[in-house]
């Protein structure tokens, strides 16, 4: 079983998500990924992958692997903010990896 840890940025995004159906789908998708079924995912570069959720405006969760059984949810958004969210995820990862 894989564990997904969350950054404060990811938690803030999830808390601000007003659509209860979308929030439920995001949480269900994380549980599914923890059970080993990540679904529709794709690498976006620099060790970061995008988990796509096909509901509403098309939500995206950005994460990276941390060892064999751990992933870190960096940030999230939707299709309209995809490019900015990828830049944010890369910056967050770079800051986390800095000594």
Describe these PLM feature segments.
Residues 63:
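Basic nucleic-acid-binding interfaces
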